[in-house]
Amino acid sequence: MSIPSPAHRQPPGALALGGPVVAGRYQLKDLLGRGTLAQVFRAADLDGGPDVAVKVAVDDSAKHFERISNEAAVLAALRHPSIVRFIGLGVVPGGTALAGRPFLVEELALGPSLSEAARTGRHHPDVIAGWARGLFEALAHLHGEGLVHRDIKPANLMLSGLRRSPVRIVDFGIVAAAGSPAEPGVSSGTVHYMSPEQASGGPVRPSWDVYAMGLVLLELLTGSKAFPGTAIESLVARTLRSPHVPDSLGPGWPAFLRSLTAMDSAERPTAAEAAGMAARLMPVPVDEATTPCRRMAVFPARRIRQLA
């Protein structure tokens, strides 16, 4: 997807009222986050629409133009309530410190990240099961397009406050095609949530995202990372063993998490299968509870040996 050039400089008085205006209508306000590749701002819609998120590259190099363009193309192709919606892209106009940098406009996920949620304390397993279902359904949609996120972690999963999609996946900056080879000398993802095969630099696989989501869910339920320590300690540990999953997490959860984080990627469920498993861990609605029996998690036959 090509990035259009800025059509104009800043509107008169724009900087006096606040931050730069991009795409002719979105005025940058608060800095929401900063990474090695980009900064993310909350922006007001001067045409009266809801606030949006604007991701601005750290510089105007060709590499960052390509990254923003690729991320925009990915988001524009996706349509799922648990994936942030693409709005537009362009180049920051002149007259500001950000001038000339490519930017991406997307839907603003209103709530805190699951990283912040994890720090505030443990959450009820029924709530986490609902989050898991929506997130795995979103991953199934992404994987169905032949793409892999590669950086599933609590900081990239945002609470939205909406019933239809309580959690949303953000930051598609390093998405890659399934089956593509690892880039020599280039690290992808976040060390503490990488699968063993991602850490070793194998071909890109959807199972990477499934494993990472398993570690996220385990962290939410236990309150601690599965593989703590330095980056090297964390990487080495996951190549030697599966994460410890306590048996005390509640009915169905230990088997579910062990399947998601199996050392052998072939023993992990697909994202679509995982969404179904998460749904069976959710409480039965009152109007469906015609018997005292609670739904039990059912796992694909090919993983019975792994879970035994």
What residue ranges belong to the model's regions?
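Activation segment signature within eukaryotic-like protein kinase domains
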Residues: W131-A132
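Protein kinase glycine-rich loop
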Residues: K29-G35, V40
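AlphaC helix of the eukaryotic protein kinase fold
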Residues: V58-A77
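Regulatory extensions appended to serine/threonine kinase catalytic cores
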Residues: V286-A308
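Protein kinase catalytic-loop region centered on the HRD/HxD motif
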Residues: E137-L147
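Short beta-strand micro-motifs within the conserved protein kinase catalytic domain, predominantly
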Residues: R85-P102
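Conserved short submotifs of the Hanks-type protein kinase catalytic core
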Residues: A97-S113
